[in-house]
Amino acid sequence: MSNNAESWNQPNVVSFFDTNRTTTSDIYPSEWFFLKEQLKEGMSILDIGCAQGGFAGMIAEHLNDFTYTGVDISEEMISKAKEKYPQHNFHIVKENDYSKVTGKYDVSLVLGILHLHESWRNTIQIAWNHTKSSLILDLREIFEETVEDKNKSYFTMDINGSNEDYSEVLPYNLINSGEALEIVNSICTGAEKISYYGYSQDPAKTAVTPTNKIFASVYLVQKG
């Protein structure tokens, strides 16, 4: 059984999100590429893996009227999110239990987490089930064979400084690019259009991987 919730509750990790990933300038170009075109007044957004709800703050820079629901496995992150954005909805969920997520949203976001947990396919399925229109997700891709073995590719929790007292690691999933598209297409049944954008970059600084270059790839999956 994974210990991912405890990993994201680590003080050094929580403190990183106190001041990062809260404004448009903080998000990656790959994330903004599709999201900026989806923003519309009055829209509803589901953010899976919301951390401290930073996307609520970012979206508020561009929209006056929207509803935002964020879910995360970290109790510490959700507590901070509720303090920062009391006007929005936040829920703690278990990694394989999204029963607190109800209804459908104009846009579902799953950004920055799929490559860092084992049940990422199920997470895509949940996000797709709960969108009325569009799903935006990102993966870390390679042209070589897929690596989903935590013994070969993993992510340490040395975010915002080292954490010598905590030895647990997360998977750092590297998905073959051709296989990734097949997976997204097979999960998102009934999709009318799948758009893709990505670029080459170094792996995360806290990751240990068998490759020195990956693709940060974002998918926009749209219903008819």
Residue ranges and their predicted role:
Residues 1-39, 43-51, 136-162:
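Conserved class I S-adenosyl-L-methionine
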Residues 52-97:
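Class I SAM-dependent methyltransferase SAM/SAH-binding core
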Residues 107-119:
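A short SAM/SAH-binding and catalytic strip from SAM-dependent methyltransferases
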Residues 121-134:
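A short glycine-rich, Lys/Arg-flanked "PGG" loop and its adjoining helix->strand segment in the class I
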Residues 169-189:
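Short alpha-helix
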Residues 190-202:
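Conserved S-adenosyl-L-methionine
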